[in-house]
């Protein structure tokens, strides 16, 4: 056998012999999108397994209904943790393993801080550490990184095949794409993402009607317009998110959004440099979808946020590690190093803020010269 094989879970059947323990290690990536049944034959082929995933992102799509699933569990006396429709491989592993066997990857390297900070607080309990290299962000001329909301007072229509779309948002998105790539000749990657299939299809159709825009987007901007599922694992320099919801939004659309916060998390965190939200901000602020209402509040606060830390807090006077914000994110090694440096006469400032980053230990000389110890 080759020392390393890379296959999808469904293609393994025709590519890998069905024999026990033929691999020393099986690595399952995007495990929140893997159903349990499809992975069992792969587990049979391996001695050990590493399961990697994020249960705050997209789950697998079940081919059976919840009612069918429950009936099968009851018929064969199988515990709910093995539910095909409700639980992924990640969920199962997370439930049966001890906390000591779990490793959390907390450093975030993709997005500008304002973009990821909402998801960090809303979905990840503030545990992520932002480590994005801002020097690699691709920005349009004279534009800053971050979140921009284009307020559109539209009207929602319901197609015969279900879902929802908003022509007012579609027209505004075409205008914004023209501004970015035709007027400003932006060369970075661009994506347009929406929760609703009909909205994505109509945006794509609208782009088809503007040949110059279509040619630029698909040849120079690695462009993608689709629903959230097509963006899992992907990223773009600029993401335009079309919320769709506004006046006359069908009740079913609101229920769908309420139950799919993980889709919203994936959608907005695909953006590296700029997240542009196109939608009715007033409607979204009271739409009865909690995470959407929180996001509106967050974006409104961004414009009013002032960062002016008190420099007096940056000179600890004792060898005891100080009480800093988000103390749960500080490792025991950081605390130990702080103490040993203090004993050696080297005074450091823990969790020193620089823009949206927090330096583990900073050495500050005369309020000017700074050294970061990570």
Please provide the spans of the model-predicted regions:
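Helicase C-terminal subdomain and adjacent C-terminal extension
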Residues: 65-103, 120, 212, 250-352
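Active-site metal-binding core of divalent-cation-utilizing nuclease and nuclease-like domains
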Residues: 342-372
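Interdomain helical connector at the RecA1-RecA2 junction of SF1/SF2 helicase-like NTPases
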Residues: 80, 86-156, 162
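SF2 helicase catalytic motif II
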Residues: 21-35, 50
């Amino acid at each position: 056998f080759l020392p390393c094989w890379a296959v999808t879970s469904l293609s393994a059947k025709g590519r890998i012999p069905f024999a026990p323990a033929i691999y020393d290690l099986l690595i399952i990536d995007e495990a929140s999108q893997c159903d349990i049944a499809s992975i069992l034959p792969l587990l049979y082929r391996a001695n050990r397994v590493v399961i990697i995933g994020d249960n705050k992102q997209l789950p697998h799509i079940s081919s059976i209904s919840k009612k069918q699933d429950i009936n099968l569990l009851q018929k064969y006396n199988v515990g709910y943790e093995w539910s095909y429709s409700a639980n992924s491989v990640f969920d199962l592993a997370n439930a049966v393993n001890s906390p000591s066997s779990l490793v959390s990857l907390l450093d975030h390297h993709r997005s500008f801080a304002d973009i990821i900070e909402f998801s960090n607080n809303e979905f990840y309990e503030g545990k992520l550490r932002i480590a994005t290299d801002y020097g690699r962000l691709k920005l349009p001329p004279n534009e800053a990184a971050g979140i921009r909301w284009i307020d559109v007072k539209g009207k929602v229509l319901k197609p015969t095949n279900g879902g929802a779309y908003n022509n007012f948002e579609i027209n505004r998105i075409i205008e914004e794409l023209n501004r970015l790539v035709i007027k400003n000749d932006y060369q970075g990657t661009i994506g347009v993402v929406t929760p609703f299939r009909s909205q994505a299809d109509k945006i794509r159709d609208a782009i088809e009607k503007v040949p110059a825009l279509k040619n630029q987007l698909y040849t120079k901007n690695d462009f993608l317009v689709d629903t959230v599922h097509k963006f899992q694992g992907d990223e773009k320099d600029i993401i335009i998110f079309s919320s769709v919801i506004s006046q006359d939004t069908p009740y079913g659309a609101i229920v769908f959004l309420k139950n799919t916060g993980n889709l919203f998390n994936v959608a907005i965190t695909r953006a590296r440099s700029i997240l542009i939200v196109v939608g009715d901000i007033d409607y979204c602020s009271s739409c009865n979808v909690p995470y959407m209402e929180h996001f509106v509040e967050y974006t409104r606060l961004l414009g009013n946020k002032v960062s002016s830390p008190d420099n007096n807090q940056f000179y600890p006077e004792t060898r005891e590690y100080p009480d800093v914000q988000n103390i749960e994110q500080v490792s025991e090694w950081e605390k130990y190093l702080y103490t040993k440096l203090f004993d050696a006469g080297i005074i450091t400032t823990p969790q020193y803020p620089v823009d949206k980053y927090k330096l583990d230990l900073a050495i500050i000389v005369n309020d000017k010269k700074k050294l970061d110890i990570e």
